[in-house]
Amino acid sequence: MRLLHVVVATVSLTGAITSLIAAQHYNVSSDVIGGIEKEDFGVGCNSRTKYPTAADTSKLQPRFAYLITNSLADFIAVHFIKFNLPDNDFVQIRAADPSAVDNRVLRYRGNESNGVFFADALSTKSVIVELFTNASSSAQKTNSSKCVGFAVDSYQYLGEGSTLNGSKEEVCGADNSREASCYSGYTNAFRASNAVVRLLIKKSTGSFFCTGWLIGSEGHLITNNHCISTQSHASNTEFEFMAQGSSCSINCEGARACFGSIRASYATLIYADATLDYALVKLPINLSGQYGYLRLRSSGAVMNERVYVPQHPAGWGKRIAMKSDNGFGTVTSLTMGGCAPNQVAYYLDTQGGSSGSPVLSWSDNAVVALHHCGGCPNTAINSYKLVNDMKWRGILPANACT
């Protein structure tokens, strides 16, 4: 469990740092799996560095600092295997480069964070992990059943698009999807895309990109079960809104490109269903008033109706797939097999990371299917199945369907 304080500024420190240890991994080592690099550092908790016990009168200088550098990194997300600090102490993580685009400063405080968790990912190739203490540790409250301090065992630095059982979500012919802002003139569709969110899910096997979207008016979000299937997944997911270019000319083709606003770093899992491949979570803050929300069509998709898919393929900035090689995208089947029986099919372009995207009807901007599987055509779970299942379980959010 942890609460995160974010300061949007870089930190400038003067004077000597008590302890600065550099771990510079310029190349991937042989034991790296899925964008994970092993580490072994910390303060207290049986690490090589003892936890400070003398009072610290300075609020500017860290008592400990550790540098992580990886030239292959798209981001760096530190994994804490132990975290139990005195109430007023905190660990701070920031980009080592003061000119880094992602200039957030992440702070995890002793009275708000504990246990095992991933820090938020910073989009940079080098970070500094620092410990700040504000008073004698002996005078502050801690969990007496645990060691005092923190320990890091690894960090994640690359993400891949999540797919269902290795199925390939595909571009069908030429990639006809476009940057979301290219469709700003299509007012209703562009407004609907505001509810679509880029997800970075940090799992024990690595980091994965997916797409999710706000459903109903109570602060819920839906994505695929193969993206989020456990509370641990939900607790280690970053929910990034408005990750898109401000104009059509801006190229957002890159993992975590066109940085948006990470409004939540965890969620509560309401239910995940493997058969229908959906996961319903609730964010710690209701953002439906700010970004709007989408609604499922209770009657489901209609054969040959025009559809479009706002999405974050490969963790890129938001794109909208509205056209195929043969014109505007339409529902081409309601009975497609493959990843599931009786799927909705369409020839709109997707990639790994598009999983969980809404398939919306052009006529009423209702969600008619939940994209989840690749191939040409690409396929999705019909919306009426989701509505019926959530109603039966008593978990359908308010204003979640038409």
Swiss-Prot record:
Motif RxLR per UniProt: ranges: 104-107
Pfam families according to UniProt: Trypsin_2
Signal peptide: 1-23
Keywords of this entry: Glycoprotein, Secreted, Signal, Virulence
Keyword Lipid biosynthesis: no
Glycosylation site list: 27, 111, 134, 143, 165, 286
Subcellular locations according to the entry: Secreted; Host cell
One GO cellular component term noted in the UniProt record for this chain: extracellular region
InterPro entries in the cross-refs: Peptidase_S1_PA, Peptidase_S1_PA_chymotrypsin
Family classification: Belongs to the RxLR effector family.
Free-text comment on this protein's domains from its UniProt entry: Has the canonical translocation RxLR motif, but lacks the canonical EER motif, which characterizes most oomycete effectors identified so far.
Role summary: Secreted effector that completely suppresses the host cell death induced by cell death-inducing proteins.
Full protein name: Secreted RxLR effector protein 73
Organism: Plasmopara viticola (Downy mildew of grapevine)
